[in-house]
């Protein structure tokens, strides 16, 4: 269970830890999904050890990632002066991050080969999400 708790802590800390990495490697869709893949693997390993379903923990990891990332972007929101962007950002990125983490988890639960498919799917979804948001 310690591995699952570490996964939740990683989900909470990841956006801050990834900030400098994403400045040098401008591929947030790949980098963020790779970290979430590590979190999902941690949860799946814990699930196999404990023989208990941890889908709620996986969902919570996606939510914690969302909240942490959104808090980091509060500075930009304050600079724009439009404070209603924060709940909108939480709503949009919440769906993205919880959705992609659940996709990887659901496809990788039974066989680790499903993780690869889930990861590629998550990266593609994240990439097109970023393009869509940039166009708003």
Regions found by a protein language model. Give the residues of each.
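Hydrophobic alpha-helical segments at protein termini of multi-pass membrane proteins
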Residues: 1-136
């Amino acid at each position: 269970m310690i591995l699952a708790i570490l996964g939740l802590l990683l989900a909470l800390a990841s956006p801050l830890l990834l900030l400098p990495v994403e400045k040098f490697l401008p591929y947030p869709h790949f980098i963020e999904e790779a970290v979430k893949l590590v979190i999902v693997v941690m949860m799946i390993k814990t699930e196999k050890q404990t023989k208990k379903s941890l889908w709620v923990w996986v969902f919570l990891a996606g939510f914690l990632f969302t909240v942490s990332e959104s808090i980091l972007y509060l500075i930009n929101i304050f600079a724009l002066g439009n404070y209603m962007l924060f709940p909108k950002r939480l709503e949009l990125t919440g769906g993205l991050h919880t959705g992609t983490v659940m996709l990887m988890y659901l496809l990788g639960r039974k066989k680790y080969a499903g993780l690869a498919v889930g990861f590629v799917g998550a990266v593609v979804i994240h990439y097109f999400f970023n393009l869509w948001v940039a166009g708003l």
